[in-house]
């Protein structure tokens, strides 16, 4: 009988552990997610050797880890004609022709938007 109790507790713990790390689809317009996207684009530009700024094009996936404010941000960005320190990059035209570049990035970001704190836990970008 004791082994059944131990097995039941183990299954409950494993079930809770498994559920707590799943990412679930969310509305890409959710406020904390949208702020996280802005931070990701800023972070990408700050850490690029390229003198040109990249701007947000579209969200491919918007996910949040269950019971947390950790977001998986999967987005596309395009290289603009503006420098990365210019104002109003959102309205800057994209480069065309030989200078045209687009990237797809996936970031995992922990967000505490109420204190303007963002922690990038993981990131991967590939040129498309």
UniProtKB/Swiss-Prot annotation:
Its main location: secreted. Belongs to the cystatin family. PANTHER family: CYSTATIN-12, CYSTATIN-12-RELATED. May play a specialized role in spermatogenesis. GO terms for cellular component: extracellular region. Glycans are attached at residue 122. GO terms for molecular function: cysteine-type endopeptidase inhibitor activity. It is found in: Secreted. The gene is Cst12. Residues 1-21 form the signal peptide. Pfam families: Cystatin. InterPro entries: Cystatin_dom, Cystatin_sf, Cystatin_spermatogenesis. Keywords: Disulfide bond, Glycoprotein, Protease inhibitor, Secreted, Signal, Thiol protease inhibitor. This is Cystatin-12. Disulfide bonds join 82-92, 105-125. Located at the very proximal caput epididymis (at protein level). Expressed in epididymis, Sertoli cells and testis. Also found to be weakly expressed in ovary and prostate.
